[in-house]
Amino acid sequence: MKALHAQRPSADRPSQARHPARPLLPLGALMLAGMSLGAHAQTAPATTLPTVTVQATEDAPQDGHRATATRVGKVLQDPHDIPQAVTTVTNTLMEEQQVGSLKEALRNVSGLSFNAAEGGRSGDNMNLRGFYTFGDMYLDGIRDTAQYNRETFNLEQIDVLRGSAAMLFGRGQAGGVINQVTKTPLLGNRGRITGSVGIDDYREVTGDFNKELGDTTALRLNVMKRDEGSWRSNPADGAEPEIHREGLGLSLVTGLYTDNELTFNHYTLKTRDNPDYGISFDPATKRPTKNFAADTFWGTNNTFDDSDTSMSSLVHQYKLSSQAEIRTQLRHASYERVYWAQAPNRTDAPSFDGSTGSPKVRQTDTENLTLQSDLTARTSLFGMKHELLAGIEYLKEDSSRRSLQDLDPGAGRFYRPGAFTSAPAITYQGDTLAFYAQDTIEFVPNWKLTLGARHDSLDAEYSSLNSPQLDFSESSIRTGLSWHPTATTHYYISYSDSFSPTADLYQLSGGSFPAERSKVTELGAKWMLMEGDLALRAALYRADKEWERNTDLESTAAILTKKRRTDGLELEVAGRVTPNWEVFSGFSLMDAEILEIAPGADARLEGQRPRNTPKLTFNLWSTYALGGGWKIGGGVEAKSDRYAYVPTAANANSNFIDGKFSPNTAPGYARWDAMLAYEQKSWAARLNVKNIFDRVYYDAVYDQGGFAIPGTGRAIILTGEYKF
């Protein structure tokens, strides 16, 4: 069978093989005028961990559960070599689990929890290591922070770089960044069509087609259409929190496998969902209410969540020599979203006209223009090996939001896109210019020192009268010391920081506060076993955040906490244990605490665990090839309980019972899934069962404390695949 996932030299996912080759490292084209850099080929000693190589053959194997390459560190390299914790969700893993949305894929990431609604941030919204990631979503290394629900049909893998990463990506948080890696063209002609059906009206069709147009030119097209019902419904009118999504990803490359490569990418995604705001908390029990069954839905047949996303990119890669490359990306992105959701009611049952529950309405339009250019090179200086990176980035952001007008003059409610209240739109314009540089120095054999710095200048302006024009000029650093005693062992200690101004969140507060700062120290180890087929990692970290910003657009508070901390332990294993047995698993322990409360907040909140930060998370997915084309698999995703409360409250009596801190709490859970597959050269069939035991669990919480969203009930999905 011709593998649709064969890789090309400049792709973000090289082959499974681990053989010595030259890595390509990042400066911007705009900084290169009049500058030249000599690069000299170096032969790594046998004890130095070899960098990845790339197979250019049509039938190169795709990654299994272990990713062999990533560009999340701005350099195409094996995740094993990065002095920072990295989790990669591969395409194979997503296919085996029948993953459609980014949210479902990220269930494979330990230490990650899901937020619900967030007062307007009802798109993809997660916490990593207890810190929000709203401003840390990326697509091929470029910011993708708009509010929408992302899909995986056009993704090759998802890289999660843990810890502060502002030196590499710009303003951000302590938890880390989530970088989506898109599929790219290959040489050769091949394709795949997949169709899936399941209970609760699940229907999905995807297509992945690659066409060779010339010796160095190729086109790749990915398409998707999915419809889903739900196990939950409104008893008054039968409405369900439905999903209706369709998308297209197109990529054309010329100069493939040459020193001068140009790629054009275009991506569109349309969603027409009925949003789900879950179940209210009971003020007496501090748990999701039992007054209504967990399958009760407060939305109606008229509520909606419509979004249209469009992105066009040009990527130019030019090899200055065998040891130096410049890579430039230009992207225009447009995001349009409008929704009406009904938040649940603690005492009143759902109605057909929206008269019960609380309406959440908003229309947002965002337009981003990004230019990013990186120069990477390898050279020797004073007898030491250097891996150099330098870059420049310009980002222009333009966003507006408005509230919708209730068109029903009676007791019910009715909203429609484009029907606004008389209040003017709230707008945000921001211009960011950044310069960054990094050097990884092998100063003695097997020891490497990474030193990096970045400076961001942000000029932002709000239309809100009590929001001044904001100018921020901040620097970030990244350091790491690595020891490679063998080619398969890596021990490191790293330190990084990051910043995020109010402007980053579009929270529109008129208050004047210092920029949010995060500092992360991490001690880690990475091992490669089974001749490189199995990767293990362990990390101990401390993450501190000061002047933590509020991300809830419904709230007027700007600061959540003055200082908070998470101390954590992470363990992860990914890859092949035997030729037939693969595994992907992660375990996370988090000890989180509010060290200093927000100005004016209740002093009793100091020392408490922050919101939506479970003490423990665990995920496991494992498959075994039985022979004759048969494969079985299964796994579990588990989280301990998560708090939901307002940390800015001046009087937090509702969170204390007899002096004991007792906020609203989403209970811990464990969800078990299973898979059975039969694979042949040109076709395959797969049966997935999600939530085998049909447990009611709450996988997302609105961290202000209002409600929690139940996870999927038992889902049975049958998939057929044709490959040619």
Please state what every model-predicted region is:
Residues 49-188, 498, 523, 703:
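Acidic, small-polar-rich N-terminal luminal/periplasmic segments of exported/outer-membrane proteins
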Residues 255-259, 366, 385-387, 393-397, ...:
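Structural signature of Gram-negative outer-membrane beta-barrels, strongest in the C-terminal barrel
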Residues 281-296, 347-355, 401-426, 550-561, ...:
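Surface-exposed loop/turn segments flanking beta-strands in extracellular/periplasmic regions
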Residues 313-331, 335-343, 484, 491-492, ...:
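Membrane-embedded beta-barrel scaffold of Gram-negative outer-membrane proteins
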Residues 628, 638-653, 677-724:
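C-terminal beta-signal and adjacent terminal beta-strands/loops
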